[in-house]
Amino acid sequence: MEQEQDTPWTQSTEHINIQKKGSGQQTRRLGRPNLTQLMDHYLRIMSQVDMHKQTVSWKQWLSLKNPTQGSLKTRALKQWKLFNKQGWTD
């Protein structure tokens, strides 16, 4: 019998039942994740993605050399429009 390979996805989303065999060995049976587990996993992943986007955005801001008030305003408006457009399409 072929054993299933655990991936980060199955480890974090699938409910694992551990049972003991007669020989004392433990077997793992992967069950279907419930809605709460899936939502929890989704929110964790999206939070990580959002933090990464924020970090990248701040690095871009900090990399600007001698920004003027006008260039910062223009850049902020572009970022805001892009963010709003992505927010509605996701």
UniProtKB/Swiss-Prot annotation:
Domain of life: Viruses
InterPro entries cross-referenced by the UniProt entry: Flu_proapoptotic_PB1-F2
Main location class: host cell
GO biological process terms held by the UniProt record: symbiont-mediated perturbation of host apoptosis; symbiont-mediated suppression of host cytoplasmic pattern recognition receptor signaling pathway via inhibition of MAVS activity
Keywords: Apoptosis, Host cytoplasm, Host membrane, Host mitochondrion, Host mitochondrion inner membrane, Host nucleus, Host-virus interaction, Inhibition of host innate immune response by virus, Inhibition of host MAVS by virus, Inhibition of host RLR pathway by virus, Membrane, Modulation of host cell apoptosis by virus, Viral immunoevasion
Localization (cell): Host mitochondrion inner membrane; Host nucleus; Host cytoplasm, Host cytosol
One Pfam family of this chain: PB1-F2
Region (Disordered) location: 1-30
Biased composition regions of type Polar residues, renumbered to the chain: 1-28
Region feature Mitochondrial targeting sequence, mapped onto this chain: 65-87
Role of this protein: Plays an important role in promoting lung pathology in both primary viral infection and secondary bacterial infection. Promotes alteration of mitochondrial morphology, dissipation of mitochondrial membrane potential, and cell death. Alternatively, inhibits the production of interferon in the infected cell at the level of host mitochondrial antiviral signaling MAVS. Its level of expression differs greatly depending on which cell type is infected, in a manner that is independent of the levels of expression of other viral proteins. Monocytic cells are more affected than epithelial cells.
Family note: Belongs to the influenza viruses PB1-F2 family.
Subunit (UniProt): Oligomer. Interacts with human SLC25A6/ANT3 and VDAC1. Interacts with host MAVS.
UniProt miscellaneous comment: Is not encoded in all strains, and seems to be dispensable for replication.
Name of the featured protein: Protein PB1-F2
Organism name: Influenza A virus (strain A/Memphis/1/1971 H3N2)
Gene of this entry: PB1
